[in-house]
A protein has these predicted regions:
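Primarily recognizes the serine-hydrolase "nucleophile elbow" in alpha/beta-hydrolase
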Residues: 96-143, 177, 275
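N-terminal cap/lid segment of alpha/beta-hydrolase-fold proteins
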Residues: 153-174, 273-317
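Bacterial signal peptide processing site
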Residues: 54-57
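Alpha/beta-hydrolase active-site loop
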Residues: 77-93, 167, 171, 178, ...
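The feature captures the conserved acid-bearing segment of alpha/beta-hydrolase catalytic domains
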Residues: 135-218, 266, 310, 315-316, ...
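Short beta-strand element of the alpha/beta-hydrolase
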Residues: 318-330
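Cap/lid segment of the alpha/beta-hydrolase catalytic domain
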Residues: 89, 138-151, 239, 243-246, ...
């Protein structure tokens, strides 16, 4: 454990947060609004989703994505046909050395939780605009808001209070208690980190701390932190320019005059040289599966269905890898359709490189259920009102996600 520190929630912030029902997402625009003073911006709305906290605030409706909700994006046209019927998630011949997790924003925080807690299963992680393990600590949503980039200052930069020291202390303790897998598993594992220099939602310092944390435990890290990107998942199929903030939070960036492909970068780290990306019609199948058999329920702010992409070769019995892909807040299927699944740019590589991709899905929820109006994955303990074990193997939502991995891999 290294030295570090935490600034507890200041009285002024507590005062600001006292009328939690005053926080609302502007459903008439895809972009953030900018109130005076401390700007209650996208980190609150996206990475944490506190709108209406404690009082059943409205979850964003279809208007939040404006007319783009009706667009037919290019990636959708070339992807495997969209899922129409709900089936049962199947087991495939998965190579245990090729099981990975990836996520953006709330899904990035959740990906770190899954990777750290189940490091004997996951052999690598790709994290976009997430943060250190157990970043929210025991303080729930308010702690997440104060310490993990939840408020944006007048300088348009997310505020930040480091949780690195507390994170590593908790991680070490839980590893010794065996509530998570041994931390020694992280040594040598490939980890990809993405942080845009223009990110107003998750402070780049949070991702710098995550880089330090993974380095501390001996992971092999590639840190992409030089692109002038706003908050979002980067891929050639992203419909937003690199520096644009807005729904569906899927951006495309360029490097040396060419379109960049962050997914190619981390898949190469994980798998070695790749077969070419399929930019045409995919041979694999995109299908919906029943999440409820794994314990998904409105009480965990989880949808009844998720999506899975299965390359034809994997369906025919070839040995394949697995990617568990976790979306961010305001990227749930009920809000943006299949744009996360088709614009992430994973399926195109998975199709030619034998990777099954599982896309769990969340739903927005509010009191009397979990306060999660922006359909974030649980990285502060909202499940079942409050889950103190949210970052452990026994965490309620973590258990659901891992059960999906167990089904696909056949791992006990």
């Amino acid at each position: 454990m290294r030295s570090g520190g935490i600034d507890r929630i200041p009285p002024t912030l507590k005062t600001t947060l006292s009328d939690e029902n005053s926080f609302r997402f502007d459903k008439g625009t895809t972009m953030m609004t900018k109130p005076s003073g401390l700007r209650l911006a996208a980190a609150m709305m996206l990475a944490i989703g506190l709108a209406g906290c404690g009082g059943g605030g409205d979850s964003p409706g279809a208007g939040a994505v404006a007319s783009k909700q009706e667009m037919t994006v290019a990636s959708t046209a070339k992807a495997a046909s969209a899922p129409s019927t709900v089936g049962k998630l199947q087991r495939y011949q998965i190579d245990p050395a090729k099981v990975f997790v990836a996520g953006i924003s709330s899904g990035g925080f959740a990906a770190v939780q899954m990777h750290v807690a189940h490091s004997s299963t996951f052999k690598g992680a790709a994290v976009y605009a997430g943060g250190v393990y157990w970043c929210a600590g025991v303080g729930g949503a308010l702690s997440a808001l104060a310490n993990c980039g939840g408020l944006t200052l007048s300088t348009n930069q997310a505020s930040y209070n480091s949780m690195l020291m507390e994170s590593e202390a908790y991680l070490d303790t839980q590893s010794s208690l065996r509530t998570i897998d041994p931390v020694a598993n992280l040594r040598g594992q490939p980890v990809y980190l993405w942080s845009g220099t223009q990110d107003e939602v998750v402070n780049p310092l949070e991702m710098a701390d995550l880089n330090s944390e993974y380095q501390h435990y001996g992971a092999r890290v590639h840190f992409d932190n030089a692109f002038p990107a706003e908050h979002g998942w980067e891929s050639p199929d992203g419909e937003l320019a690199c520096g644009t903030l807005g729904s569906p939070y899927m951006v495309r960036c360029s490097a040396n005059g060419a379109v960049y492909d962050s997914v190619k970068t981390w898949l190469t780290m994980f798998l070695g040289p790749l077969k070419p990306r399929n930019n045409g019609k995919l041979s694999g199948t995109l299908a919906s599966f029943d999440q409820t058999e794994f314990g998904a329920s409105p009480n965990l702010s989880m949808s009844s269905t998720g999506s899975v992409f299965v390359p034809r070769s994997c369906a025919q019995g070839d040995k394949c890898g697995l990617v568990l892909a976790l979306h961010g807040c305001l990227q749930e299927a009920s809000l943006i359709g299949n744009r996360w699944v088709t614009e992430a740019g994973i399926n195109e590589w998975a199709d030619t490189n034998k990777l099954v991709v599982v896309y769990p899905d969340t739903i927005a929820s509010s009191a009397p259920g979990p306060t999660n109006p922006n359909a974030c994955f649980d990285w502060w303990g909202y499940s079942n009102q409050y889950d103190p074990n949210y970052a452990l193997k026994s965490g309620l939502q973590m258990s659901v996600l891992y059960a999906m991995v167990q089904r696909v891999t056949g791992r006990p």
